[in-house]
From Swiss-Prot:
This is Glucose-6-phosphate isomerase. The active site is at residues 343, 374, 513. The keyword Isomerase applies. GO terms for molecular function: carbohydrate derivative binding; glucose-6-phosphate isomerase activity; monosaccharide binding. The gene is pgi.
Length: 545
């Protein structure tokens, strides 16, 4: 590791954070913090492009924050950030630059601007031709991809449903399991369907299996002109041509899969939204890039959230974080963040290959509110593990794009108020809790006749002091979504930089792939030689499918 890029645990700030935690932070109480600081909300509120973050309900005081910011400086975070934006090969295990930010920068504001914008212009022109359904004849667009070639577009299209074109339906197929693709095919007309085969290498097993099946269906149903109904987004254009595809939009090896929404992989988003809205998505992301690059660390939202992740993971020992978007359009955001965060930072060695003596990525999971409240919030409030929660709320929503009777508008507006009230109430309840004395003083609901009131009160009490962050979006539009996703990308970069890891490779995906290639023929031959006892037993149980 470069002498200017120090691993976090080797800094003086890390040692001082450990001492501060032992001395006082381990017993930090949010209720006491708010009682002692009438301006805590203002002190820990952060404005960033298109969103506001309330960090005040986190286990964070001024000394801890100062030490975390010192930690960022001692590991050389600003230098690493600037190196990434300039195109340095930060992905050191693959010798590649990390330049997803260049995909959303103005033409002359980042490396590779000319080629990026040439590809973008061509892709958006194609998207507009598809959207002209009177001439294209396309009514259904099916994106076939997996991982970074699926999760970003699959998250973005429903999030921006209000900006999509009526009469043009988007579908996403990722799973190797035919139960995802097969039922969809029964609903499609080959002459009005466009398939997008999204694979960086054009060799991904799941994607190519689904692509071959889609192609066979197209031909079996009398489909003609594969080149007009299949398009590829890939770095391997030759393989796409061999498949029978004439139209392919490329991208570059300095674009990681989970950072590729902004590239040609975003084609299904561009078709759904149109060129103007897709450029707004890029513009929102670029605004967050500039915030990350220029805002002081003390007011830099991605930096603060990344440092908070380190604080909780390495000093408080918390193992996971729950994401609860209070907007149904963001229902796929938790799944998107799972790949972005855990594939990036789920590493056990540093950039030099040295084993890490501390934990890295937390488990990231979640569901939309209020559904989540009726699923796992019981554990968040009363469970034995403390799990920080990230609430995402959208102030203004509209259903004007839908053909609904005007009489529904006040009812839907009231539903939105109730939704926001639920979001705020959950973060308040996690912090405030309810003591046994409070529970005992309340009129209790009907309980077992032989249960003493004090025992019931223990069941009905809440420990409180459970941390949360609330992200407030003015509205869910393309620019706001772009800023939100870019913020999460830079947050991942920040925590990865402190941990001294390469956040841009994913070797953990490869071993299972290799073993699958070895096992696949054995499912037919039954050959179990050289395998472990468990795998032998499972092969025998499966027989020959």
């Amino acid at each position: 590791m470069s002498a200017s890029w120090v691993r976090g645990d080797r800094t003086a700030a890390w040692a001082d954070l450990s001492a501060h935690f032992a001395a006082s932070a381990a017993n930090f109480d949010l209720r006491t913090a708010f009682a002692g600081d009438a301006r805590r909300f203002e002190r820990f509120g952060v404005e960033a492009p298109h969103l506001f973050a309330d960090l005040s309900k986190n286990w964070l005081d001024a000394p801890a924050l100062a030490l975390l910011l010192r930690l960022a400086r001692e590991v050389g975070l600003e230098g690493r950030r600037d190196a990434m934006l300039a195109g340095a090969p930060l992905n050191n295990t693959e010798g590649r630059a990390v330049l997803h930010t260049a995909l959303r920068a103005p033409r002359d504001a980042a490396p590779h601007g000319s080629e990026v914008h040439a590809t973008l212009d061509a892709m958006l022109a194609f998207a507009e031709r598809v959207r002209d359904t009177a001439h294209s004849g396309i009514t259904d667009v099916v994106n076939i991809g997996i991982g970074g070639s699926d999760l970003g577009p699959q998250m973005a299209v429903p999030a921006l449903q209000a900006y999509t074109q009526a009469g043009l339906r988007s579908h996403f197929v990722s799973n190797l399991d035919g139960h995802e693709l097969a039922p969809l095919l029964t609903q499609l007309d080959p002459q009005s369907t466009l398939f997008i085969i999204a694979s960086k290498t054009f060799t991904t097993q799941e994607t190519m299996a689904n692509a071959e099946t889609a192609k066979a269906w197209f031909l079996a149903r009398g489909g003609r002109d594969i080149a007009r109904h299949f398009v590829a987004t890939t770095t391997n254009v030759d393989a796409a041509v061999a498949f029978g595809i004439d139209t392919a939009f490329g991208f570059w090896d300095w674009v990681g899969g989970r950072y590729s929404l902004w590239s040609a992989i975003g084609l299904p988003v561009a078709i759904a939204l149109g060129a103007t809205h897709f450029r707004a998505l890029l513009g929102g992301a670029h605004a967050m890039d500039r915030h990350f690059a220029t805002a002081p660390l003390e007011r830099n939202l991605p930096v603060l959230l990344g440092l908070l992740d380190v604080w909780y993971r390495n000093f408080h020992g918390l193992t996971s974080r729950s994401v609860a978007p209070y907007h149904q359009g963001l229902r796929r955001l938790p799944a998107y963040l799972q790949q972005l965060e855990m594939e990036s930072n789920g590493k056990c060695v540093d950039r030099d290959g040295e084993p890490l003596p501390f934990a890295t990525s937390p488990v990231v999971w979640g569901e939309p509110g209020t559904n989540a409240q009726h699923a796992y919030f019981q554990m968040l409030h009363q469970g034995s593990d403390v799990i920080p929660v990230e609430f995402i709320a959208v102030r203004d929503t509209s259903h004007a794009h839908l053909d609904l009777p005007p009489a529904l508008q006040p009812l839907l507006a009231e539903q939105q108020r109730k939704l926001l009230a639920n979001c705020l109430a959950q973060s308040q309840a996690l912090m405030a809790g309810k003591s046994e004395a409070q529970a005992l003083a309340e009129r209790a609901p009907t309980a077992a006749a032989d249960m003493p009131r004090d025992v019931l009160a223990r069941h009905r009490s809440f420990p409180g002091n459970r941390p949360s962050t609330t992200l407030l979006l003015e509205r869910l539009d393309p620019a706001t979504l772009g800023a939100l996703i870019a913020m999460y990308e830079h947050r991942v970069f920040t925590s990865g930089a402190v941990w001294g890891i390469n956040s841009f490779d994913q070797w953990g995906v490869e071993l299972g792939k290799a073993m699958c290639s070895e096992l696949l023929p054995r499912l037919t031959t039954g050959d179990a030689s050289g395998l472990d006892g468990s795998t032998v037993g499972l092969l025998r149980k499966l027989g020959t499918p």
